[in-house]
Amino acid sequence: MRFKGLDLNLLVALDALMTERKLTAAARSINLSQPAMSAAISRLRDYFRDDLFIMQRRELVPTPRAEALAPAVREALLHIQLSVIAWDPINPAESDRRFRIILSDFMALVFFDKIILRLAREAPGVSFELLPLDDDPEELLRRGDVDFLILPDLFMSGAHPKARLFEERLVCVGCPTNEQLQGQLSLEQYMSMGHVAAKFGRGLKPSVEQWLLMQHGLKRRIELVVPGFNLIPPLLSGTNRIATIPLRLVKHYERTIPLRIIEHPLPLVSFTEAVQWPALHNTDPGNIWMREIMIQEALRIGI
């Protein structure tokens, strides 16, 4: 199909090349042969009068022109997919849809497990791909590469719709044998003790408790950094280290790991866990159904 002289199939090829950055992988992703993909690149270059991609160290590096085209091309393809091709009222009992969701290990453990159990009964064909926190989740939402982002809402952009899930509170926690945790913890004690902290993504972005502490201008003595909240409780056992983690996570682990909960010496505000989805998916029936399930389950655990 052509539109003003452009074969619209070439836009699919351009999007694949921008995503994969390798000729063979891009061709495979849209079921083209390598020669056919090479021909598509040639035709794209002729139409846009630009090289679009330059080979460097066996990788296709996009030119500024290709970088400028990419967002509009991806948005157009997503709009066609969601509004024309894929739009269909969902039948949960028969659906085989897969949802890609970015969330922390903490939320997977204390919240999303309930979604999985519920849908095993109500929509057994639905599956999930749970992804770790990314350095640029907003870009993944914009590209439609993920269906949902579950995070504290203070980390979410205003570019996409979102909904509140529940309030969470931070507490200080340590091993019961830690003699410094026998009474109320002063700010001086808190700052002088060794801490275990979680950071996320390749760029090791701070977690919510570190972000909140930074708002008070405080920097802890972090002795151990781990790639997620769920590793923290086991690593406190037998040590004098402490951590600041969500209360629901402590409640989950205290059944199997001895932990002592101490009120935080700072009036740290509770934070809101929220779910966000791509703006282009806002009217997608499957997306609407899935986020309603999440909001219903969040209401149950938020009581």
From Swiss-Prot:
Task: Give the DNA-binding residues.
Answer: 23-42
Q: Which UniProt keywords apply?
A: Activator, DNA-binding, Nodulation, Plasmid, Repressor, Transcription, Transcription regulation
Annotated PROSITE patterns: HTH_LYSR
What residues does the HTH lysR-type domain cover? 6-63
An MF annotation (GO) of this entry: DNA-binding transcription factor activity
The protein's job, in short, is: NodD regulates the expression of the nodABCFE genes which encode other nodulation proteins. NodD is also a negative regulator of its own expression. Binds flavonoids as inducers.
PANTHER family linked to this entry: HTH-TYPE TRANSCRIPTIONAL REGULATOR LEUO, HTH-TYPE TRANSCRIPTIONAL REGULATOR LEUO-RELATED
The similarity comment for this entry is: Belongs to the LysR transcriptional regulatory family.
Q: Which named protein is this? A: Nodulation protein D
Organism annotation: Rhizobium leguminosarum bv. viciae
Record lineage: Bacteria, Pseudomonadati, Pseudomonadota, Alphaproteobacteria, Hyphomicrobiales
